């Protein structure tokens, strides 16, 4: 993470794609993976670019036709694990491919395999969760709400009954002395045993209608949940791994539609038209709430232990996360026009991979002094 931003962005490369996209970018020091649509808008395309040059290395494409809200492109972020990458399209096509070559190792369509009949107007949005050589997804079938596949073979390890999926991603961690998967289905919050898929607990929020897009966070054995109707809540757990349904902290002003909070030390940050900063040591008390011209309903964020990068409409904001007033200490414009960025960027070292419309950029966030020293 940079501690300052250069006055002007330093472009390493840019690549034009046939379409924009909503799904996040996955990257390491060699490969950049992302999903989009072909020119006809009949096919999903997952694309691998060279991280150094931006040149295309491989792509897979397959027929995927629907009439989803907000377009048909993949919503999820690819999951890189070792020499493989797991890809999930909006219509339920789940692939595991070789990272270096794009060779397809296995494939399932979740909707057809598990007879999913529920209405999914936004498609599959939750990114695959990789745990102990298992690929865990919300399939959304009545007898297969959550499914775990073997990473190597694609065979089903377990499946568990339940409801249609939410539009957020799952998380995993230690809660109440148990390692468990946590997340939302269409209407409830829940926990599942990672080895068997058995549902451990269910919590129905007091106000109906949450889209359940933000991903729950696990913080020191507690669960932080933020949604648009029920606000931001922190829950503790019983010794048997079940949730205590009464929150230990609440903030009813922070009600994000889409943004997942980020925690730095005792401060919780989230964007929902403002940049909010809440204090985890004082009952989620609001420390600051900043309005900025580049902030809307959603912003991706990346943090270290002192700074926060916020990706707004056409600009990057650098925030000092160590002060209660959370000042914006630098900003950098990456587009001359106001562009909504719904695709989560990837930061590898000082290289930022960011999608804006149909263009994928690689920016160097190294300071100009460091850049000159390395020339």
Protein language model annotation of sequence segments:
Residues 1-375:
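Noncatalytic, solvent-exposed loop/strand surfaces
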């Amino acid at each position: 993470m940079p501690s300052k931003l250069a006055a002007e962005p330093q472009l390493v490369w840019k690549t034009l794609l046939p379409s924009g996209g909503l799904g996040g970018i996955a990257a390491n020091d060699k490969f950049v993976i992302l999903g989009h649509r072909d020119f006809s808008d009949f096919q999903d395309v997952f694309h691998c670019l060279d991280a150094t040059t931006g040149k295309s290395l491989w792509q897979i494409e397959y027929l995927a036709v629907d009439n989803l809200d907000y377009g048909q492109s993949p919503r999820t972020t690819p999951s890189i694990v070792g020499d493989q990458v797991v890809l999930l399209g909006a219509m339920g096509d789940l692939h595991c491919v070789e990272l270096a070559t794009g060779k397809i190792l296995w494939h399932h369509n979740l909707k057809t395999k598990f007879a999913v009949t529920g209405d999914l107007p936004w498609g599959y949005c939750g990114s695959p969760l990789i745990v102990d050589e298992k690929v865990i997804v919300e399939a959304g079938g009545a007898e297969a709400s959550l499914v775990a596949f073997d990473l190597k073979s694609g065979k089903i390890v377990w499946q568990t009954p339940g409801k249609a999926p939410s539009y957020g991603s799952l998380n995993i961690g230690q809660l109440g002395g148990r390692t468990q998967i946590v997340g939302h289905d269409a209407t409830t919050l829940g926990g599942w045993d990672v080895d068997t898929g058995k549902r451990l607990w269910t919590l129905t929020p007091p106000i109906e209608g949450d889209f359940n897009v933000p991903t729950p966070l696990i913080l020191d054995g507690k669960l932080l949940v933020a949604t648009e109707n029920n606000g931001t809540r922190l829950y503790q757990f019983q010794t048997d791994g079940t949730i205590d349904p009464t929150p230990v902290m609440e903030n009813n002003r922070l009600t994000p539609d889409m943004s997942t909070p980020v925690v730095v030390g005792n401060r919780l940050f989230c964007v929902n038209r403002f940049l909010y900063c809440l204090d985890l040591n004082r009952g989620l008390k609001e420390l600051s709430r900043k309005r900025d011209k580049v902030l809307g309903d959603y912003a991706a964020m990346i943090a270290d232990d002192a700074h926060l990068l916020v990706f707004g409409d056409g600009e990057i904001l650098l925030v000092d996360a160590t002060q209660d007033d959370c000042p914006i200490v630098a900003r950098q414009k990456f587009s001359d026009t106001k562009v909504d960025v719904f695709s989560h960027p990837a930061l590898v070292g000082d290289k930022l991979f960011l999608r804006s419309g149909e263009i994928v950029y690689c920016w160097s966030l190294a300071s100009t002094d460091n850049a000159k020293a390395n020339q």
